[in-house]
Amino acid sequence: MIAYIEPYFLENDAEAASAATAAGKSTDGVSESLNIQGEILCGGAAADIAGRDFGGMNCVKPLAVVRPVGPEDIAGAVKAALRSDKLTVAARGNGHSINGQAMAEGGLVVDMSTTAENHFEVGYLSGGDATAFVDVSGGALWEDVLKRCVSEYGLAPRSWTDYLGLTVGGTLSNAGVSGQAFRYGPQTSNVTELDVVTGNGDVVTCSEIENSELFFSVLGGLGQFGIITRARVLLQPAPDMVRWIRVVYTEFDEFTQDAEWLVSQKNESSFDYVEGFVFVNGADPVNGWPTVPLHPDHEFDPTRLPQSCGSVLYCLELGLHYRDSDSNSTIDKRVERLIGRLRFNEGLRFEVDLPYVDFLLRVKRSEEIAKENGTWETPHPWLNLFVSKRDIGDFNRTVFKELVKNGVNGPMLVYPLLRSRWDDRTSVVIPEEGEIFYIVALLRFVPPCAKVSSVEKMVAQNQEIVHWCVKNGIDYKLYLPHYKSQEEWIRHFGNRWSRFVDRKAMFDPMAILSPGQKIFNRSL
């Protein structure tokens, strides 16, 4: 039936849409041909929704956008693609991919936002510990899950991303990492059950016990094996407040040693949130000292820095959860007991107390500012990597202190994670050596007035960093990976490539799903 719509919607403009209407072919008819209850958008309307992403460096023309009512509509779109010779299907959450991963040129894009409210139910796992969970739609935004869980049940998911304007299915298809991951692992380690539409068009419930191969394939699977329509996410009691702290270091070795000590402690012997970032040793308002203070009344005093410090500095970012019923003295003692072990620069400590939900939504204000000044709509050539503890010192000396010593016009995150909190049965790949590895995120923002050449230079610098890693044998993996050839993907997955290929053969043998990742080509 998909052949029915192709002749009428190959041209992505109003003229083609008018011609189709004149011929008596409407989008209602297309919906019927796909056997779905939801809406179909074609032509310019489809391109407006699914032709660009947050990265802003790719622009493609999908054949149509499917706005499903539920999983059966998604399965219908996949089955229609299977009946065609060349159509592909991509799931699009909130469009936050960087390199076109959620796009389908000439294919069908499934707009998961229309399913956001299909599931929301809190329950408890069977067993003695009464662990709470919430069933949510794959198209739900994490910020909405947070607000509803806390306001209605006093509960919250355990593991987060920094920015919560992302869909549940989107982050679970990658990993989902923030400052809680050292304790609970990524978001992929905090789900117990999924509903998935596979590349065969099947709607399948899966877990560690039931259809386990699909379950672990989809988690971190880059959308290659199925589209997540429901996830069962583990919950815990939500705290009321967070003590948010930043402390500054001049020496990378001391910064990393303190961070590694914190993430290696047992729950009550550490903070609840541990992250870190690099910033420029200067007054640049976007890249330098002003990015560190947490409150308008705070001021970064550069006279506290030794004259010997280098071009970049380092900041540990910490969070401690507490209840309204906890006394200030109790919280202060817990903080001082932990802070007292750290070797940051005296006088460069900043802290505020704020509600738990506000802390988790802290990036929301940055989003609002970026939308006001236009940088939310400009390209975002971001680079995210996992780097082993063994090589993070070399990475600092070459990348932080040389290649990006003037900043990237956005945050430069670096903080440790623990291998033991990640499940190697999932499709996520991390560095090969050691218990501790680091996430590095160069989150570049482009000024609205910037020339195309400046974006190209940023992309070239990202490539230079990756090439340096390869040339020097750095134990690294791209997070939110983007490659253009299968040879690069084979190198990325290493000895897990054969498992990845086998899983593809099981759950999407025609390579229908997620063509924007550029891992497999559509099979006839």
Curated annotation (Swiss-Prot):
- GO cellular component terms attached to this protein's record: cytosol
Q: Which Pfam families match?
A: Cytokin-bind, FAD_binding_4
Leader peptide range in chain numbering: none
Note whether Flavoprotein occurs among the keywords: yes
Enzyme Commission designation: 1.5.99.12
- GO terms, biological process: cytokinin catabolic process
Q: Which cofactor does it need?
A: FAD
Reactions catalysed, semicolon-separated, are: N(6)-dimethylallyladenine + A + H2O = 3-methyl-2-butenal + adenine + AH2
Q: Which residues carry this modification: Pros-8alpha-FAD histidine?
A: 96
Classify the source by domain of life. Answer: Eukaryota
Please provide the record's keywords in A-Z order: Cytoplasm, FAD, Flavoprotein, Oxidoreductase
Which residues hold FAD? Answer: 91, 93-95, 97, 101, 162, 167, 173, 177, 228, 479, 514, 517
The FAD-binding PCMH-type domain, residue ranges: 58-238
Q: What is its main location?
A: cytoplasm
Tissue expression, as annotated, is:
Expressed in the vasculature of roots, hypocotyls, cotyledons and leaves of young seedlings. In flowers, expressed in the transmitting tissue of the gynoecium prior to pollination. Expressed in the mature embryo sac with maximum activity in the egg cell and the synergids.
Q: Where in the cell is it found?
A: Cytoplasm, Cytosol
- Molecular function terms in GO for this entry? cytokinin dehydrogenase activity; FAD binding
What's the stated role of this polypeptide?
Catalyzes the oxidation of cytokinins, a family of N(6)-substituted adenine derivatives that are plant hormones, where the substituent is an isopentenyl group. Catalyzes in vitro the oxidation of various types of cytokinin nucleotides that are known as direct products of cytokinin biosynthesis.
**Further details from the record:** Plants over-expressing CKX7 have reduced cytokinin content, and seedling primary root does not develop lateral roots. Plants over-expressing CKX7 show reduced leaf size, plant height and number of flowers, and increased number of lateral branches.
Q: Which family does it belong to?
A: Belongs to the oxygen-dependent FAD-linked oxidoreductase family.
Recorded protein name is Cytokinin dehydrogenase 7
Source species: Arabidopsis thaliana
